[in-house]
Amino acid sequence: MFKRTLIALVAGLIAAWGAVAWSQVKEIPWGTSAVGSAGHKALVVLAELLNREMPNFRITVQPTPGAVVTVKGYAMGQFEGYYGSDIAFYELRNDTRRFAGFKASMKRQPVQSFWTYTTDMGLAVHARDKGKYKSWRDLTGKALFTGMPPWDTRAQLERAFDALGIKYTYRQVDLSAAGSLLQGGGIDGFGLYTTGESAVPPWIAEASLATDWAAVNPSAAELAALKKAGFAVLELKPEVFKRNVHTDKVVLLPFYYGFHVGLEVPENDVYRMLTIIEKNVAELAKADSSYAQIAKDMPGFQKLGVTSAADLLPIHPGLARYMREKGVWDAKWDARVAK
């Protein structure tokens, strides 16, 4: 009788402990961009790593129409993780463009916690038309798919076009149809981009099977105007695209993207998350070459990301701790650490 009672008691304690441990698992619904986008692929890879290495968290990848939707979703309590860029954070900070009128309704303030890669924007047309377009201004009035309406990639091109005085006809298309529409003349061009200076998003890789596209670079005068307007400029070799791009280099305009969480995830957990990412970054880069930049220099890339957005939104204390330990923190950011 005593033995049976003891066994039952031990079993009950084990079950109770298991229930407590289970209740301590924090659910992280993490918003990202649409299936087929670079952001969706990258978060799937990251979530697999973090779910394995941080069993106290359960990350679920939540695709949305675009990254800006995830920033707004976090601010309204819909997501615990979000996919945010310096472009989106600028618009949020200044209550403009896609965030016009949004700040007044926010329930919580987004913060920056992990910078992942640059997204590097350019333009492509059909190879048969490459002789027609010697500059971006040559695309004035043309029908272009610059990305889905909420996408930061589209916002980056819109900013560049504004700086150059380019007006075009926006054509929204299904990602899976972009290649066939370019082939058939339904669109004259699309927004071309890489992530991490090395990865082509799945939808462009798919489009490359349906059509032969050529990169179009800004002219020298356009590049000078873009640099004067504050744009960074990047040149990539054609080999990055693993196909003939019909030019000897591809000129792109990079901006910074990250997978961020808010203060609901404590400092120690964000710090641990960053150290786990750094320890396993080769695995991430092998699964998705978007992670090539942080594989080369994780602390240095965090500094670049924070530099791009330090004045736009607060910095998670876990990221600040990581950067201080790595020697890449600037004391001028002390006042920007979220409380």
Regions found by a protein language model. Give the residues of each.
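Bacterial N-terminal signal peptides that target proteins for export
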Residues: 1-9
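Bacterial N-terminal signal peptides
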Residues: 8-17
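Boundary at the C-terminal end of the N-terminal hydrophobic targeting segment
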Residues: 18-25
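Bilobed "Venus flytrap"/periplasmic-binding protein-like clamshell domains
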Residues: 25-53, 57-60, 121-184, 194-195, ...
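Divalent cation-coordinating acidic motifs and surrounding scaffolds
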Residues: 63-83
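Pocket-lining segment of extracytoplasmic ligand-binding domains
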Residues: 86-88, 94-104, 112, 125-129, ...
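Ligand-binding clefts/hinges and TM-proximal coupling segments of bilobed small-molecule sensing domains
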Residues: 134-135, 142-157, 230-299
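An extracytoplasmic/periplasmic, membrane-proximal ligand-sensing/linker region
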Residues: 177, 194-215, 225-227, 268-339
